[in-house]
Amino acid sequence: MQNISEQQVKGSKLPNVICMLPGSSDKVIIVGAHFDRVSEGDGVVDNWSSASLLPSFYEGLKNGPHKHTYIFIGFTDEEQGEVGSRFYARQMTKDQVAATDAMVNLDTLGLGPTKVWVSHSDKRLTDALVQTATRLNLPVAGVNVEQIGASSDGEQFAERKIARITIHSFSQEAFNARIIHTSKDKLSAIRLDDYHQTYRLLATYLASLDQFGGSLPVPTAH
């Protein structure tokens, strides 16, 4: 994996980790996941389940032609208030913001089938994910998490008027099980079949986003 850099973040001991996969145009798709965790549990679900997939998505995209430059980012200190993503988003220049067609945020995967935080996701990006899932015959559903006080790194990009989507696996069942931010957050909490389906869906989805221009039209399902 080439083009890896570390971005020192003011106030954080650990940097953001950034990997760029250059495309043939100046347009950009950001794919992000935080790698930090709270002290309770192992942090497997929240959020190594997401951060550990970033290299796999890179490998899946690197050998095919693509117009967009994909920027994969492991964000630091999300659990401290989206510190890493806030720093990254705020240091983006106006030209960088204008060039960014989408920000795909991954947080807490593998508790069950793929979910989307619909109320905090761009409708066009959400529609494109649903169409991809339909094409692959894979499950996806909308579950909003703001009512439990949740937030995530995608919100920092929304403040810069960048289209974003947050993909997760949270549900009422998972909430009732009290897995997140507890000692139950360990490998045994991951439902591997659901996790693999989420990976398949996201790998295809990220590739399909390259078809989009700045207006992000929804591609025709086939």
Question: What does each model-found stretch correspond to?
Answer:
Residues 1-22:
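A non-catalytic alpha/beta surface segment that caps or lines the substrate-entry region
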Residues 2-9, 73-75, 143-145:
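Conserved beta-strand termini and adjacent loop/short-helix elements that scaffold enzyme active sites
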Residues 13, 37-132, 149-154:
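Acidic/histidine-rich catalytic neighborhood of metal-dependent amide-processing enzymes
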Residues 17-20, 28-32, 71-74, 101-106, ...:
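Structural recognition of the beta-strand scaffold that forms the well-ordered cores
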Residues 20-25, 218-219:
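N-terminal hydrophobic or amphipathic helices/low-complexity stretches enriched
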Residues 24-26, 34-37, 109, 172-176:
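Short connector loops/turns at beta-strand edges and beta->alpha or beta->beta junctions
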Residues 113-222:
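Active-site-adjacent substrate-binding region
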